[in-house]
A protein has these predicted regions:
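Non-heme di-metal
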Residues: 1-187
Length: 187
C-alpha cells in the first residue's frame, strides 16, 4: 500500500495538530519509531520462527503508524532524539527475543499495554475538549491496532501468571516507557 493510500485509509490527510497536542504527537512519533525498531531487533533472532512471524505481522502495523505520525507532524515538531529511540527499540526487541518467545510476548504485551493507556489519554483529552475529532479518530484506529498486538502477545504467551522476573521486566518496561514519553514530549 502506498503512503497516500495509507493516509487515506486512516483519514489523516487534512488534519492539523492543535498546539496543545504537539508534545503528545511528538511522543507518539517517537514511540512508533521505537516500536518499528523493536521488531527489527527481534527479527535478528532468525532461528525462532514464532518470533519471526509475530515480528513480521506486528512490524507492518507499526510501520503504518509511523507513516501516519510522519505525515501528521512537521519535521521541526518531531523528537530530536530519534536515534536514541531506534537504539532503545532495537535493543529491547533483540534482548527480549534472545530470551525466548514467551519473554518476547511478555515484552510486547507490556509495551502495548502502556501504549494503549497513552493513546487513551489523548483520545479522552480530545473528546473532553471537543477538538480535532479527525485526529481523535486516527488515534482510535492506532489504539485499536495496538490493543490487537497486546491481545495477540497475551494469547501467544498463554494466560498463566508471569514469573517474578517477568513481572519485574514488565514493570521496568512500563517505567522506561513513561520516561521515554515524558522526554519525547519535550525534545
Amino acid at each position: 500500500m502506498e503512503n497516500f493510500e495509507l493516509i487515506e485509509k486512516y483519514n489523516a490527510s487534512d488534519i492539523s495538530i492543535p498546539k496543545n497536542m504537539v508534545g503528545w504527537m511528538r511522543s507518539n512519533h517517537a514511540g512508533e519509531t521505537g516500536a518499528v525498531w523493536i521488531y527489527l531487533g527481534a527479527k535478528c533472532i532468525f532461528w525462532n520462527k514464532k518470533i519471526k512471524l509475530m515480528s513480521k505481522e506486528h512490524y507492518q502495523t507499526e510501520k503504518n503508524h509511523l507513516i501516519i505520525m510522519n505525515h501528521l507532524l512537521s519535521n521541526k515538531s518531531k523528537s530530536k532524539l530519534l536515534i536514541l529511540w531506534r537504539i532503545l527499540g532495537f535493543s529491547l526487541g533483540f534482548i527480549s527475543a534472545l530470551l525466548g518467545y514467551r519473554f518476547f510476548c511478555v515484552t510486547i504485551q507490556s509495551v502495548e499495554s502502556f501504549v494503549e493507556q497513552h493513546y487513551r489519554e489523548q483520545i479522552e483529552f480530545l473528546y473532553k475538549k471537543s477538538i480535532s475529532f479527525d485526529l481523535l479518530k486516527v488515534l482510535e484506529m492506532c489504539c485499536d491496532e495496538e490493543v490487537e498486538h497486546q491481545n495477540d502477545a497475551k494469547m501467544q504467551k498463554g494466560f498463566d501468571k508471569n514469573s517474578v522476573f517477568e513481572n519485574m521486566w514488565s514493570n521496568l518496561i512500563g517505567s522506561g516507557s513513561n520516561v521515554a514519553v515524558n522526554v519525547s514530549k519535550l525534545i
